[in-house]
Curated annotation (Swiss-Prot):
Extracellular side: 18-419
GO biological process, one term: recognition of pollen
Annotated TM spans: 420-440
Protein name: G-type lectin S-receptor-like serine/threonine-protein kinase At1g61440
InterPro entries named in the record: Bulb-type_lectin_dom, Bulb-type_lectin_dom_sf, Kinase-like_dom_sf, Pan_app, Prot_kinase_dom, Protein_kinase_ATP_BS, S-locus_recpt_kinase_C, S_locus_glycoprot_dom
Catalytically driven reaction(s): L-seryl-[protein] + ATP = O-phospho-L-seryl-[protein] + ADP + H(+); L-threonyl-[protein] + ATP = O-phospho-L-threonyl-[protein] + ADP + H(+)
Keyword line: ATP-binding, Cell membrane, Disulfide bond, EGF-like domain, Glycoprotein, Kinase, Lectin, Membrane, Nucleotide-binding, Phosphoprotein, Receptor, Serine/threonine-protein kinase, Signal, Transferase, Transmembrane, Transmembrane helix
Length: 792
């Protein structure tokens, strides 16, 4: 009987309903909410000695911590306790009885107790009156739970928002914080220090106007209330999801996360792409996700710095082409006009005009010379702008209508342009009809030339068609001295056109059926993609059995000649390698999120990175690339194509590919750039460890510093190298969900915020056999178990 009693007492001691003066909370004990959803207790990261007091979702693995008491000061001894003081305050004390954290001074004459509510709110309550004396919902961390609030009070100066963790394993305040603004209507900001990083746009009753999926039909879980006394409160409540949270990540991303019983799914993330980054296009510029180039000037404005815009730096913005001469009621040539732009995220620095309808909004702006633009928005009313139009985006659908004041002469410019355009179109149609007639006759005569028909049926604007004799002359009839390389597609030659342009000519192998598909794919894709970190296609040539693709020539050829070359590797010091790494990621970000086409490359590797005369990287070879439509995030194929070693586990074995499979390939590429070793040929030790296994070993021993190419010792930056090794390992994680997305990847490379710890990559446990290395891979998934995978 005695033994049974001891067991019962031990069980009860691990589970508390409340913390009292007589019943403190020790390490190993927890406090649970009455509904069993939330739990409070001591925890540590990666079994370290640093102990924190926090709240998490009970029973969900891995543990998701939503609030930390002592986020800046962990305790390091096992005798720490969470106690109620004689005055009623909640204290965290260490083994020496030093106060590590407290709720602050609380007055409870008859004592107090602490309990955890069903909504995850830790509350200290008066024992007699039951009044709440202190609550964690008024001291937010990086997470907003349902019914908790962000707020401001202009009278008291109080502000309450979210602050990011330094890293996934360090809850101390990081670089980012979230606030709602006191302006009317309010908007949400993610700040990086004192600099805006992301903006939601103004609030319109149930939605933020800068988030396109929150249209007027959106069923909103959010609530924002502003009163006449200068206070504002933002909160949310999910009726359809028992477990949900809004989280600010250490990289500055706001995520709305919902638990589906198996995993946390993000229903919204901001910033979602580089257009979402605050002010990316500068004053009077706007960002267009679906139409490269990414930034444009509003009608009537031109880039302030053409050279900067050509380099892809748009932050200087745009300047007015014709100055305004505003005199209120003036007419004729002196009058101003308004140009409307649809699907717009309302710019920052707006002013609210109360009790004005749509016509009144227009009239108010028209007769106010300082008014540069206006918008009448359902759920808000009239907004006007008298300062720079900053942080503006144009969505493919949704958004608001913005009316911008222009000089009357801008309309005259438009009319003159329309006249010129009309004449040009007429002439062009005549020329096109002539060529079409000739082309029809030529194709009837040369009916076997089906390739040209295929090309003419594709939407390939701006593509130049070269004659075969032109290319033969440029390449000295494809002489061996001009040959740059050879691959599964065919051979690549250097050439020089009569106008002096240097070109690279990819000559399709006539025996390659796969090459035909690659050829068509590459023409259609690359002609529509324009970015400084993507190779540019100039045109093509199709004549008889010859199929040629003509590119801009890259003076320094491909990256592999520098990374793996015994002599040239010395020319690539660490700073230059790091610049190349960042350039590749920017090109990937454009493919995955910023171009009007969402493209998965599927064959990212060192040899497919070309270098121009300034050693700027250009992603090339889009023959295997796939397009994603709308909200599509992954696809599956029965025909797996790619390069062995660079393919992610889920793609190699099941045919599933996504943004995360390109991230895996980049991780391998990154580790090759750092180490100077090729994944298909590397073998280490008696066991013949593969490259990823060796990288993991280096990471465990020295955090990857000893992985660096020995030729770079004098030029290296150990901390930067170690960080890149860690990022590379995060990219080659077995589960796609454990890999960063492309936007997070760029943030990891360009900030110093702490990173999550990588797990051992699955492919890192394998060793190499004695077979020769394979290069390009092309197999069918349902035949995989019976196939021997060899290179082409």
């Amino acid at each position: 009987m005695g033994k049974k009693r001891i067991v019962l007492l031990l069980f009860i001691s691990f589970s508390y309903a409340e913390i009292t003066k007589e019943s403190p909370l020790s390490i190993g004990q927890t406090l649970s909410s009455s509904n069993g959803v939330y739990e409070l207790g001591f925890f540590s990261f990666n079994n370290s000695q640093n102990q924190y007091v926090g709240i998490w979702f009970k029973g969900i693995i891995p543990r998701v911590v939503v609030w930390v008491a002592n986020r800046e000061k962990p305790v390091t001894d096992s005798a720490a306790n969470l106690v109620i003081s004689s005055s009623g305050s909640l204290l965290l004390i260490n083994g020496k009885h030093d106060v590590v954290w407290s709720t602050g001074e609380i007055s409870a004459s008859k004592g107090s107790h602490a309990e955890l509510s069903d909504y995850g709110n830790l509350m200290v309550k008066d024992n007699v009156t039951g009044r709440t004396l202190w609550e964690s919902f008024e001291h937010l961390g990086n997470t907003l739970l349902p019914l908790s609030t962000m707020m401001y009070n202009l009278v008291t100066g109080e502000k309450r928002g979210l602050s990011s963790w330094k890293s996934y394993t360090d809850p101390s305040p990081g670089d980012f914080w979230v606030q709602i603004t006191p302006q009317v209507p309010s908007q949400g900001f993610v700040m990086r220090g004192s600099t805006p990083y992301y903006r939601t746009g103004p609030w319109a009753k149930t939605r933020y106007t800068g988030i396109p999926q929150m249209d007027e039909s959106y069923t909103s879980p959010f609530s924002l209330h502003q009163d006449v006394n200068g206070s504002g409160y933002f909160s949310y409540f999910e009726r359809d999801y028992k477990l949900s949270r809004i989280m600010l990540t250490s990289e500055g991303s706001m995520k709305v996360l919902r638990y589906n019983g198996l995993d946390w799914k993000s229903s919204y993330e901001g910033p979602a792409n580089s257009c979402d980054i605050y002010g990316v296009c500068g004053p009077f510029g706007f960002c267009v996700i679906s139409d490269p180039p990414k930034c444009k000037c509003f009608k009537g404005f031109v880039p302030k710095s053409i050279e900067e815009w050509k380099r892809g730096n748009w932050t200087s913005g745009c300047a007015r082409r014709t100055e305004l001469h505003c005199q209120g009621n003036s007419t004729g040539k002196d009058a101003n006009v308004f140009h409307t732009v649809p699907n717009i995220k309302p710019p920052d620095f707006y002013e609210y005009a109360n009790s004005v309808d749509a016509e009144g909004c227009y009239q108010s702006c028209l007769h106010n010379c300082s008014c540069l633009a206006f918008a009448y928005i359902p759920g808000i009313g009239c907004l006007m702008w008298s300062k720079d139009l900053m942080d503006t985006m144009q969505f493919s659908a949704g958004g608001e209508i913005l009316s911008i004041r222009l000089a009357h002469s801008e309309l005259d410019v438009h009319k003159r342009k329309m006249t010129i355009v009309a004449s040009t179109v007429s002439l062009t149609l005549f020329v096109i009809l002539g060529f079409a007639t000739f082309g029809f006759w030529r194709n009837r005569v040369k009916h076997h030339d089906a390739w040209r028909n295929d090309l003419q049926s594709q939407d390939v604007p701006g593509l130049e068609f070269f004659e075969m004799n032109t290319i033969q002359t440029a390449t000295s009839n494809f002489s061996l001295s001009n040959k740059l390389g050879h691959g599964g597609f065919g051979s690549v030659y250097k050439g020089k056109l009569q106008d002096g342009r240097e070109i690279a000519v990819k000559r399709l192998s006539s025996s390659s059926e796969q090459g035909k598909q690659e050829f068509m794919n590459e023409i259609v894709l690359i002609s529509k993609l324009q970015h400084r970190n993507l190779v540019r296609v100039l045109g093509c040539c199709v004549e008889g059995k010859e199929k040629l693709l003509i590119y801009e020539f890259m003076k320094n050829k491909s990256l592999d000649t520098f990374v793996f070359g015994s002599r040239k590797r010395l020319e690539l010091d660490w700073p230059k390698r790091f610049d190349i790494i960042q350039g590749i990621v920017r090109g990937l970000l454009y493919l995955h999120r910023d171009s009007r086409l969402r493209v998965i490359h599927r064959d990212l590797k060192v040899s497919n990175i070309l270098l121009d005369e300034k050693m700027n990287p250009k992603i090339s070879d889009f023959g295997l690339a796939r397009l994603f439509q709308g909200s599509q995030y992954q696809d599956k194929t029965r025909r797996v194509v790619g390069t062995l070693g660079y393919m992610s586990p889920e793609y190699a074995w099941t045919g599933v590919f996504s943004e995360k499979s390109d991230i895996y390939s980049f991780g391998v590429l990154l580790l090759e750039i750092i180490s100077g070793e090729k994944i298909s040929r590397f073998s280490y030790g008696e066991e013949g460890k593969a490259l990823l296994a060796y990288v993991w070993e280096c990471w465990c021993e020295t955090r990857g510093v000893n992985l660096l190419d020995q030729a770079l010792d004098d030029s290296s930056h150990p901390a930067e190298v170690g960080r890149c090794v860690q990022i590379g390992l995060l990219c080659v994680q077995h589960q796609p969900a454990d890999r960063p997305n492309t936007l997070e990847l760029l943030s990891m490379l360009t900030t110093t915020s702490d990173l999550p710890l990588p797990k051992q990559p699955t492919f890192a446990v394998h060793t190499r056999n004695d077979e020769p290395p394979s290069n390009d891979l092309m197999i069918t998934v349902n035949e995989m178990t019976e196939s021997v995978i060899l290179g082409r």
